[in-house]
Amino acid sequence: MNRVTDSGWNHEYTEANGIRIHYVRHGAGEPIFLLHGWPEFWYVYRKNIAPLAEKFDVIAPDLRGFGDTEKPGTPDPPEALRDHMVEDLEAFADALGLERFGIVSHDVGSYVAQAFARKRPERVAGLFFFNCVYPGIGRRWTEPDSVKEIWYQTFNQQPWAAGLVGSGRESCRMYIGHFLDHWAHEPGLFAEDLEHWVDNFLRPGNLQGGFDWYLASNPSRMRMMHEGAPEMEKIQPPALFLWGESDPVLKAKWTDRLGEYFANYELSVTSEAGHFVHYERPELANGEILDFFEKTFREGDV
């Protein structure tokens, strides 16, 4: 494990599950992981890390294939990536000596959080979700006002997609910037950080590393679209969802079946955010996260 301090951020690296994981770590106290989505990397939590670190040990990793974490390539079959990511989290926590922890997650990271909570519920103090996929969405991806929003999920699976998007700085800026603008409550909210996103995704392997997620998740997504919402045992650790109402791709109305998949959950919807609540409304997000984990860790110690 080694540490690099850059612009006030504590960057660390550790080996876990056969790969080198990069993460930013601040604070002390009970541990919480911040798991990002796509098109994101650890830096999407830059407005959250310091406030949360006032009370918690905050760990924001780059997921396998993203950011500065190692990119071992597209697995064969691609679906294996999903299991690898869950195994990464467990091995990563073990490497850090953490037995029980909270998880904040969004988008892709929320798949990892849900799958881990099903596999190892005793290690999860609580789950805090921003807009995310869950099984209850079912066939609703194919509704007329939704199917036009998910074209990128097919595009990202094409073998030439990373080469096309990464062919130049402007093409990368245009593609990644589209989602940061279109999915947010207000266009331009990411303007001050857009070049950081472009820098990140132009690093070798980072575009394909993110696109691999869509190769990995396509079979299960197709099953949901054709067969509908599957029956599954409910996730047991306490969960709180903070959902941005303006999200065009993961709609707030789709939260209506959360109770079928989570045994103990609360839902809060904000009209002043889209897909990226943690970045768009950081004060709201930070307050909700702090309150939730102060409660769940306290109750877990009883």
Model-derived features: positions:
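Serine-hydrolase catalytic-loop signature spanning alpha/beta hydrolases and amidase-signature enzymes
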Residues: 39-47, 58
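Structural cue for short, hydrophobic secondary-structure segments
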Residues: 34-37, 60
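A short, Lys/Arg-enriched amphipathic alpha-helix followed by its capping loop at the start of a domain
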Residues: 48-56, 95
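Catalytic active-site module of serine/aspartate enzymes centered on a nucleophile-bearing elbow/loop
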Residues: 265-302
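Conserved alpha/beta-hydrolase "nucleophile elbow" surrounding the catalytic nucleophile
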Residues: 36-38, 105-106
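Flexible "cap/lid" subdomain of the alpha/beta-hydrolase fold that forms the substrate-access gate
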Residues: 1-12, 20-21, 28-31, 59, ...
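Recognition helices and adjacent regulatory flanks at domain boundaries
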Residues: 44, 63-66
